[in-house]
Design a protein with these regions (language model features):
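Non-heme Fe(II) oxygenase catalytic core, chiefly the N-lobe of the double-stranded beta-helix
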Residues: 1-155
Length: 155
């Protein structure tokens, strides 16, 4: 397992492993890295939805997103963030589901609207664009630590 730090405040990249065939010790190392660095990138993993789901379940119970329009018809735990439907057809930008998807372009935290927010998200980029499509991450622990004490007291 090769671990490379991505930024001083957040993120590591892990190479040299196969997510579809993880032993318990390797998974525990991954979980520890996730808790410490908050974001993990696993480059060049060609995984199925089933492997994606099984990997996620190792972290805990999976959430089923309330939006039916982007939920996988075969695997409800998979929420499709795409302008392409499950049949490979481009979703017209006038469709309600496309408009809903467009809202995710704004800064947000996944599932923060829920009574009990999720612990994290697993994003599997199957086909990504060279322009746009950015996904950003922030270390809110670090943001809080960097606040002046008077602001922390207000919060």
């Amino acid at each position: 397992m090769i671990v490379k730090k991505l930024h001083e405040n957040i993120g590591v990249s892990i190479e040299g492993i196969d997510l579809s065939n993880l032993d318990s010790d390797t998974f525990q190392k991954i979980k520890k890295l996730w808790l410490e660095y908050l974001v993990i990138v696993f480059p060049n993993q060609n995984i199925s939805d089933e492997v994606h789901i099984e990997f996620g379940k190792r972290f805990g119970e999976l959430e089923v997103h309330p939006s039916l329009s982007h939920r996988s018809s075969k695997n409800p735990e998979i929420y499709r963030v795409s302008n392409v439907d499950e049949n490979g057809d481009i979703i017209p930008n006038k469709e309600t589901s496309w408009q809903y998807l467009k809202q995710s372009w704004l800064w947000h935290t996944d599932s923060s609207f829920r009574k009990i927010p999720s612990n994290g998200s697993i994003l599997h980029g199957i086909s990504t664009t060279n322009k746009g499509g950015n996904t950003l991450f922030a270390n809110m622990y670090k943001a809080y630590e960097d606040l002046e004490e008077s602001m922390k007291q207000k919060i």
